[in-house]
Every structure is written in structure tokens, then in C-alpha cells.
Regions:
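N-terminal active-site segment of His-dependent metallophosphoesterases
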Residues: 1-51
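Active-site neighborhood of phospho(di)ester-bond hydrolases with catalytic His/Asp-centered motifs
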Residues: 6-7, 32-36, 64-69, 119, ...
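Active-site environment of divalent metal-dependent phosphoester hydrolases
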Residues: 10-14, 40-43, 71-75, 125-126, ...
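Active-site neighborhood of divalent metal-dependent phosphoester bond hydrolases
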Residues: 41-114, 118, 140-146
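Short, well-ordered beta-strand micro-motif
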Residues: 111, 118-120, 198-202
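Divalent-metal (often Zn2+) His-rich catalytic cores of metallo-beta-lactamase-fold enzymes
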Residues: 117-133
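A conserved acidic, glycine/proline-rich C-terminal tail/linker
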Residues: 162-189
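Binuclear metal-dependent phosphoesterase catalytic core
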Residues: 179-219
């Protein structure tokens, strides 16, 4: 099986569609995990969530939709998905409510066996092998700063731009950041770079790749 992952779309529909074009969900051996922060920032937050709803309806369990901190803010703090004062498009109550209902059903993480953990921000790594018992909702969606180094399971997360001083420390970096041990960070700062990076985990080879139009790059 091949598990694809992307994160931090932030209302950028075109970049999301470009990323989706690299994933063949018609292949029975492929699965897609979306790691949160689909909204706020770009002009198409409704359309992004509606596209995810469409994918989930069509492909069912082949598409896993996880919650990010921006979705959590909508559910827990009443923040609107589209705020005209933030110049994010036009508020639409019907679309807002439909998207909020979908957001309320999102999971916090997805685990493939004991090999890979997908989430938005991270886990409480001080809990070690008991991370599932020791990790709060806050860690899954808001953890900061990002961890690096060896851990008992591979972590795939977004939340922090891979170009940031906490990861690649390179303002021109726009791809997937691998720390050389157990962490794969996939937030490519779409609002700046216009790109949603796509990660792929080959469960047979147990290898990670960055998926691009020109081919896959092993991480």
C-alpha cells in the first residue's frame, strides 16, 4: 500500500488541486491522509473543505481527514471559516454550517500499525512508547516547537513551515523536511510558496518519498 499525506492547505484551492493530481485514489492500493489546517489565509476555504467532503464521500476509508488547530478554533472558539474582515472571501451561512458539521467529525490522528503516526502538529514525545496514553488533544493540533531526533514511531506532521528556523532554517525551502531520524514535516507554507507538498509512505518498502511531477524523491 502507498499512503499519501498533505497538510496546511489554508484555503488555497488551486495548490490543493495540484497536489491531488499527484495522488491516484482510483488505485485500490492507495490511501490519502490529510493532516489539518484546510482553512484560513486563502480565498477558497469553503471550496477546499467541500472538495475534501467530496473526496471522503467518494473514496470513504481511503481518505482520512484529520483536524488542525484552525479547524479546532472554529469548533471550540467559534471562529468563522471565512471572515470578510480578514479578506478571505464572502461569508456564506449555508456553506459555513455545512463545513463546520464536517469539521466537527474530524479525527486527531491516524496510525499505520506501529510504523507511522500522522497528525497535525505532533505528540507528547516525553511519554515515549506510551505516547497514545500521554498525548493530549493540544499536542496533536497545537504542539510547538516541533520535535526532532529519534522516536519510537515515525511522525508525519504539518503545522510549522518547513522553512522555519525550527526545521530547515532556510527561507527558500519549500519541500518536505526530514530530520534524518523519525520526523517528516510537510507544511510547505502554501500562502507564500503556492505549493502543497505531498509525502508518500510505501508500506511494503517501508520508505518515505516526496512526490513531485518530475518524479518521487526518497527521503
Amino acid at each position: 500500500m502507498k499512503i499519501f499525506a498533505m497538510s496546511d492547505i489554508h484555503g488555497c484551492l488551486d495548490a490543493f488541486l495540484d497536489a491531488l493530481s499527484l495522488v491516484d485514489l482510483e488505485d485500490k492500493n492507495n490511501k490519502l491522509v490529510l493532516c489539518g489546517d484546510y482553512i484560513h489565509g486563502g480565498f477558497d476555504s469553503y471550496a477546499v473543505v467541500e472538495k475534501i467532503i467530496e473526496l471522503k464521500k467518494k473514496y470513504k476509508s481511503k481518505v482520512v481527514v484529520l483536524m488542525g488547530n484552525h479547524e479546532h478554533w472554529v469548533i471550540e472558539q467559534g471562529m468563522p471559516i471565512v471572515d470578510e474582515y480578514r479578506d478571505e472571501g464572502e461569508y456564506d451561512e449555508k456553506r459555513e454550517n455545512k463545513c463546520i458539521y464536517f469539521i466537527s467529525q474530524m479525527e486527531l490522528y491516524y496510525k499505520y500499525k506501529n510504523e507511522v503516526l500522522f497528525c497535525h502538529a505532533g505528540v507528547d514525545e516525553e511519554a515515549g512508547e506510551y505516547w497514545e496514553q500521554g498525548t493530549s488533544d493540544y499536542h496533536y493540533i497545537e504542539k510547538f516547537p516541533p520535535d526532532k531526533g529519534p522516536f519510537c514511531i515515525n511522525i508525519v506532521a504539518g503545522h510549522v513551515s518547513t522553512a522555519s528556523p525550527y526545521l530547515a532554517n532556510n527561507s527558500k525551502f519549500r519541500g518536505i523536511y526530514y530530520d534524518g531520524c523519525s520526523h517528516y514535516y510537510i507544511d510547505g507554507n502554501v500562502l507564500k510558496n503556492g505549493v502543497v507538498p505531498v509525502l508518500m509512505y510505501d508500506t511494503d518498502a517501508k520508505k518515505f518519498y516526496e512526490v513531485m511531477e518530475r518524479g518521487n524523491k526518497e527521503l
